[in-house]
């Protein structure tokens, strides 16, 4: 089903094992990661655009995405609320800054969807079927994971220290377990094998990874479902962080999943203060590490 599902993870661990002190090289890697993300998302859109019966597929995808987002939202927020009750965390008052530009953040959140849309239109109207597209996408994903492994290793973060951050570790575990429970509940609804549904539930907001990995394994339609599920998670997170973080920071930080260490971090910092930053980085880092592992393991069972 998925060619070397576990093999795809090897570049992530290889990159994480390599120390790299050259700041100029890390800058190049940063921009390379961004370019690869949009390239991969464009290929995902290309696959969607070249599906037979595209209109019917898209209407079916809309229902699947809504169900997936809703069930995961309820399960994640319930588990994060329970964790907050068990291990309450109170942001330090006086550290909160002014809100960042939500217009800029919203537009940034639309960029990945635009990349998929461009690919979809190109596949539907312009380009003939490209037999090598799947191989190219898999290769690009492996290169992306290698670069991300390098970034994680050289971000000045100690895995031991991250694991010792009880709030960050607890948030990551709560989100992971509740997502898998939600996946179990969704098995009869999505009508997929249990391991494929659990893979869908393991994106944790990492849309560029989940979209292409799920698409490679289950076809472009399910890749689109995984992508939209994780993009919508990111957008919802941006909306709820300022509303929840002062009273229930675990819920505000945790729902964003893997995005807590990058895309949603500025909102967490400005709304919750400095005390929330180490927790967000720890939980986001751990979920970024768990997501490809869980997806690879579950998809390899098919």
Predicted regions and their residues:
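Structural signature of hydrophobic alpha-helical transmembrane segments
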Residues: 1-13, 33-34, 64-75, 132-147, ...
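Hydrophobic transmembrane alpha-helices of secondary-active transporters
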Residues: 11-18, 34-57, 118-123, 138-161, ...
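Membrane-interface helix termini and inter-helical loops of multi-pass transporters
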Residues: 51-61, 125-135, 158-160, 188-189, ...
């Amino acid at each position: 089903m998925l060619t070397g599902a576990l093999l795809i993870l090897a570049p992530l661990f290889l990159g994480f094992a390599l120390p790299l002190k050259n700041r100029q090289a890390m800058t190049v890697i940063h921009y390379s990661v961004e370019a690869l993300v949009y390239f991969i998302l464009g290929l995902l859109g290309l696959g969607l655009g070249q599906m037979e019966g595209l209109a019917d597929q898209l209407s079916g995808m809309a229902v699947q995405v809504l169900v997936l987002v809703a069930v995961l939202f309820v399960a994640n927020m319930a588990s994060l609320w329970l964790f907050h009750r068990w291990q309450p965390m109170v942001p330090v008052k006086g550290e909160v800054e002014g809100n960042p530009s939500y217009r800029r953040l919203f537009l940034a959140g639309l960029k990945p969807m635009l990349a998929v849309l461009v690919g979809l239109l190109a596949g539907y109207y312009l380009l003939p079927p490209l037999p090598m597209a799947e191989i190219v996408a898999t290769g690009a994903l492996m290169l992306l994971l290698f670069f991300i492994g390098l970034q994680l290793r050289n971000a000045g973060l100690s895995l031991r220290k991250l694991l010792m951050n009880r709030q960050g570790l607890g948030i990551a575990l709560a989100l992971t377990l509740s997502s898998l429970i939600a996946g179990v509940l969704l098995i009869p609804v999505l009508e997929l094998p249990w391991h494929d549904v659990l893979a869908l539930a393991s994106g944790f907001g990492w849309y560029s990874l989940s979209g292409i990995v799920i698409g490679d394994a289950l076809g472009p339609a399910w890749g689109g479902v995984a992508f939209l599920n994780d993009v919508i998670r990111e957008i919802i997170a941006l909306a709820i962080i300022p509303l929840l973080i002062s009273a229930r920071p675990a819920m505000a930080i945790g729902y964003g999943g893997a995005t807590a260490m990058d895309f949603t971090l500025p909102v967490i910092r400005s709304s919750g203060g400095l005390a929330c930053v180490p927790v967000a980085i720890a939980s986001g880092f751990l979920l970024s590490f768990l997501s490809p592992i869980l997806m690879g393991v579950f998809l390899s069972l098919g």
